[in-house]
Amino acid sequence: MKIGETAPDFEAETTQGKVRFHDWIGDSWAILFSHPKDFTPVCTTELGYMAKIKPEFEKRNVKIMGLSVDSTGDHEGWAKDIEETQGHAPNYPIVGDADFKISKLYGMLPADVEGDPKKRTPADNATVRNVYVVGPDKKIKLILVYPMTTGRNFDEVLRVIDSLQLTSKHQVATPVNWKPGQEVIIAGSVSDEEAKRRYPQGWKAPKPYLRIVPQPQ
């Protein structure tokens, strides 16, 4: 799968009931993030933090869905540990992909994987540690793949969503380390003539291809 392709649709059992992914997204943005195995340390911190900052995603009209090859029953049992140690229990649906169907569909596991998921170790599922950001058009906007030893930075995911939502509305790009409210770059596809109409106040241009303007509102 690549950025710009349609996110594969699926129907699955989650901790909040059965869902069809595209219908569940509706007109919102969405994050599908997977983890190698329940009852593991790094994942415990990740799912707890995601629950803590869920309101920030909701402000941006972003829905959250987790996934692993464990059962929904295991997810529910693990949620108690997450709340106890992290202060927040998962407050978003988590897919029970015990038949590996979705992990295979998204290319996180080889097509020939089979067997009892309970017998698989976290190392067996090391490739099931991804983040997908999906737009209202059901297209994949971002793919992040992390190693098992490195917890994900969900604040960075928020920053990227801010950039994606801004640049989907305005013909701009965001520069290195950009944060909301900072200057942006006029997209290269916008001619100087069109830029003058859009930005009558002008822009800074240390080079002709680098046209800097305040963030559009």
How would you label these PLM feature ranges?
Residues M1-Q217:
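Chalcogenol-based redox active-site neighborhoods
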